[in-house]
């Protein structure tokens, strides 16, 4: 506010002290979003400075310029500055006696400004200048942002009301219009009532103090009630559609998140399967290397077996040589028996000992040969068993690898099938949801259009009935007025005639009294004249009685007309009650439609809950598939552990066999 005050003082050659003091007071006040210069007489220079400052130098939400005595040029400069302003929401210009130039500037402001929501123009006499007010109404019709307009005490006549009605037909944002204490009259009220058939946004229209009939005021109030009900229904439907769209977007986000999580878990499972495949391939390669090592060990065992067979052949050769030596010794003994007979006993003993020793050695060598043969047989059996085990392990390994590959392929196929089925189910559910939403929206739009048509028809019928009622009332009033005028005329005429006759009789009586004084001698003549006068008086009385009877007949006619009027009014009331009953029936039908809308919303909620249950079922199926995958992984890990156990058992058996064979070779060497 201080910057605004300095800018104002800089722009004005002679700034107004009252304006500076008001700006200084407002700058010290806590609320700085309001420019309040009410009841300050602003000069033309001040208006020009404010018009230059308002577009961008100040950020005010409210501008109060009431009772400032603004001139035409000052108003033009101020409103020209507000045309490009985008922060002012409320403008107060009451009590400034705006004229044609001001009205045209207001129309231009309403055409160009897009931020003003409230405009107060009380006590300005805008309706006096028809051209300026028509320009203002054109600007109001082109504006789609103003929500509240105050036009109290502006001397607006029925022509101005017609211009306002034309503007309201084109305006789609104004919600409150105050036209109290103007001169709108019957024609202006009807024009405003007719414009309300096309304007559905106006919620409040004040017409007090405008000489507008009560039936038109009631019709305007009913139209306002219809507009308010329509706005509430539209706001409720918009809120519900926004809530439903948000829920649908949330469901879509949840579905996409769940699908992405599922894809991530599937990718992780694939990675784990690939890693387990790589690990199993590494283990298979390790087992292949172990088999190769076993083959090399078998080759070494075969070489050792050949060596043992060679050693066995050498031992047999030794046995053969020993047999030859035994035969040679026998021959030598036989040849030397003759020469050494003396030494025979001693040599016999020695020979027997040697023979026993040789026989023991021979039996020991035979036993060793048998033991070695048994070991060779056992080794051959063990080799065959190990070959069978190796072959069985190879078959088991190939079977397990084939089963693993088959299970992996089946798992991938199942995953692909589940993906396709899940995608298909998602697409089907999405298409069904879209179809249901479209059907509901179409049904709601059709029902809303039918309701609007019914409301318009009922409003037209109501307006026609009100016009007929007003016409009947006017006709009854005119007839009653005519009857009263005729009765008054008849009464006046009877009174005049009676007065004339009374005056005439009085004159005659006066003449008779004068004649009695003058003509006492003519008593008979006077008596005759008195008799004639009595006869005439009787005739006059009879005529007066006839007039009274005529008056009574006229009174009876008037009473009959009153009764007819009452019957007509009762008939109109009955018809109005019937129309009200029809309107209430239509209202009940509308309530039924609302209940149907609520039922449809409940069905939509049920469908959304079913959709959520289907999603939960899908999540359960996904969890079951995950559990199956986990069980398959557990089976694979168990089979891998069994293979590792078998490999370790085979390795231990081979190591035991190798250790046993090495012990056998060491014993043979010994």
Curated annotation (Swiss-Prot):
Q: Name one GO cellular component term.
A: centrosome
The answer to whether keyword Metal-binding applies is: no
Q: Which SMART domains match?
A: LRR_RI
Query: Where in the cell is the protein located?
Result: Cytoplasm, Cytoskeleton, Microtubule organizing center, Centrosome
Has UniProt tagged this entry with the keyword Cytoplasm? yes
Highest taxon, organism lineage: Eukaryota
Q: Which residues form a coiled coil?
A: 234-645
Keywords of the record, alphabetical order, are:
Coiled coil, Cytoplasm, Cytoskeleton, Leucine-rich repeat, Repeat
| InterPro entries given in the database record | Centro_Cilium_Assembly (IPR052116), Leu-rich_rpt (IPR001611), LRR_dom_sf (IPR032675)
LRR repeats span: 87-108, 115-136, 145-166, 173-194, 201-223
What job does this protein perform? Component of the proteinaceous fiber-like linker between two centrioles, required for centrosome cohesion.
Q: How does it assemble?
A: Homomer.
Could you identify this protein by its name? Leucine-rich repeat-containing protein 45
* Organism of provenance: Gallus gallus (Chicken)
């Amino acid at each position: 506010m201080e910057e605004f005050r300095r800018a104002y003082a800089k722009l004005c050659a002679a700034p107004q002290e009252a304006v500076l003091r008001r700006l200084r007071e407002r700058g010290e006040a806590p609320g700085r979003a309001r420019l309040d210069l009410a009841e300050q007489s602003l000069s033309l220079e001040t208006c020009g400075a404010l018009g230059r400052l308002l577009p961008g130098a100040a950020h005010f939400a409210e501008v109060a310029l009431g009772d400032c005595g603004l001139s035409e040029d000052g108003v033009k400069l101020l409103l020209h500055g507000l045309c490009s302003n985008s922060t002012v929401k409320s403008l107060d210009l009451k009590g400034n006696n705006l004229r044609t130039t001001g009205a045209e500037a207001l129309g231009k402001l309403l055409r160009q400004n897009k931020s003003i929501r409230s405009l107060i123009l009380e006590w300005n006499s805008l309706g006096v200048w028809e051209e300026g007010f028509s320009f203002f109404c054109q600007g109001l019709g082109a504006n789609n942002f103003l929500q509240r307009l105050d036009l109290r005490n502006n001397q607006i006549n029925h022509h101005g009301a017609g211009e306002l009605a034309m503007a309201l037909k084109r305006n789609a944002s104004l919600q409150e219009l105050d036209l109290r204490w103007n001169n709108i009259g019957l024609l202006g009220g009807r024009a405003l009532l007719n414009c309300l058939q096309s304007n559905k946004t106006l919620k409040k229209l004040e017409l007090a103090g405008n000489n507008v009939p009560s039936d038109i005021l009631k019709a305007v109030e009913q139209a306002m009630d219809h507009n308010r009900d329509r706005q509430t229904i539209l706001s409720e439907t918009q809120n519900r559609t926004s809530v439903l769209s948000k829920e649908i977007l949330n469901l879509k986000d949840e579905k996409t998140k769940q699908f992405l999580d599922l894809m991530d878990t599937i990718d992780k499972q694939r990675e784990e399967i690939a890693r387990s495949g790589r690990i199993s391939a590494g283990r298979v390669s390790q087992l292949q290397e172990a088999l190769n090592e076993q083959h090399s060990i078998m080759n070494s065992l075969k070489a050792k077996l050949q060596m043992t067979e060679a050693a066995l052949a050498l031992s047999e050769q030794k046995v053969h040589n020993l047999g030859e030596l035994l035969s040679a010794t026998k021959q030598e003994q036989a040849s030397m028996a003759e020469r050494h007979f003396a030494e025979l006993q001693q040599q016999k003993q020695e020979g027997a000992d040697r023979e026993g020793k040789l026989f023991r050695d021979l039996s020991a060598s035979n036993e060793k040969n048998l033991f070695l043969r048994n070991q060779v047989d056992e080794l051959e059996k063990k080799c065959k068993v190990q070959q069978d085990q190796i072959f069985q392990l190879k078959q088991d390994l190939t079977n397990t690898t084939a089963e693993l590959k088959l299970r992996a392929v089946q798992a991938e196929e199942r995953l692909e099938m589940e993906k396709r089925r899940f995608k298909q189910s998602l697409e089907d559910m999405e298409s069904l949801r879209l179809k249901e939403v479209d059907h509901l929206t179409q049904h709601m739009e059709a029902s809303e259009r039918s309701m609007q048509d019914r409301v318009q028809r009922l409003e037209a019928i109501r307006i026609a009935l009100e016009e007929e009622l007003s016409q009947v009332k006017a006709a009854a009033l005119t007839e009653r007025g005519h009857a009263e005028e005729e009765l008054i005329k008849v009464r006046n005429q009877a009174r005049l005639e009676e007065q004339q006759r009374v005056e005439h009789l009085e004159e005659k009586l006066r003449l008779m009294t004068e004649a009695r004084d003058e003509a006492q001698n003519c008593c008979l003549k006077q008596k005759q004249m008195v008799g004639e006068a009595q006869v005439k008086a009787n005739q006059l009385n009879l005529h007066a009685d006839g007039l009274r009877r005529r008056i009574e007949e006229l009174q009876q006619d008037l009473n009959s007309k009153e009764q007819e009027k009452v019957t007509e009014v009762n008939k109109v009331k009955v018809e109005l009650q019937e129309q009200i009953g029809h309107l209430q029936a239509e209202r009940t039908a509308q309530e039924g439609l609302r209940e149907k809308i609520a039922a449809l919303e409940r069905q939509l909620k049920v469908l959304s809950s079913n959709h959520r249950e289907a999603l939960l079922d899908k999540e359960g199926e996904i969890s079951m598939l995950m559990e199956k995958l986990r069980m398959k992984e557990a089976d694979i890990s168990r089979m891998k552990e069994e293979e590792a156990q078998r490999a370790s058992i085979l390795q231990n058996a081979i190591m035991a066999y190798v250790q046993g064979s090495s012990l056998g070779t060491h014993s043979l060497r010994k």
